[in-house]
Amino acid sequence: MSPAAARRAGIVTRLRAFGRERRGIAAIEFAVLLPLFLILYLGTFEVGQGIAIKLNNGLAARTVADLASQYTNIYNADMTNILGASTTVMAPYPTQPFSVTVSEVTVDDKGNATITWSDSLNGTARSVGQSVTLPAGMNTPGASLIWGETQYVYTPGLGYVLTGSITLSSQIFMSPRNAPSVLRTNS
């Protein structure tokens, strides 16, 4: 047998032995599947955190609308407390990308809804007199509604599964509880 043929036969023998070897299969499977499992784990974490922030965001909108609807007259200190309550609801998540707006919407005799007053934290308050489109069934002539709005810009911390920023918004309308409308006094 020539030296080249012997070398080929040796290579073929080693390849056959390698093909029959079973001792390292578990380690190879683990090495192949580990990145997939890490991505699934981190993705579950990021999505779970996004869902929790979305739930808190909705609760914050409900909180500001509920608190404002209990007043007959809201002064500046009261509004500071109402808007501040929303940041407490958002804990433990950062409130830097979070904004909250609370407004009163009044519906005239023709069913046209406009902003009566509006205040905001980390955002822009709505303009007084601005026209608003209400959800179906809410534009009862002569009615006043308290409108709580929140917005949170969620940026996943790891960015493996969710990349970029996602804007999470919530809104709720509530009727004033103790008066036909809630006054807003700047003092």
Question: What is each residue range found by the language model?
Answer:
Residues 1-88:
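Alpha-helical assembly-interface signal, strongest on the long, hydrophobic N-terminal helix that forms
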Residues 2-3, 62, 66-187:
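Short, conserved structural patches
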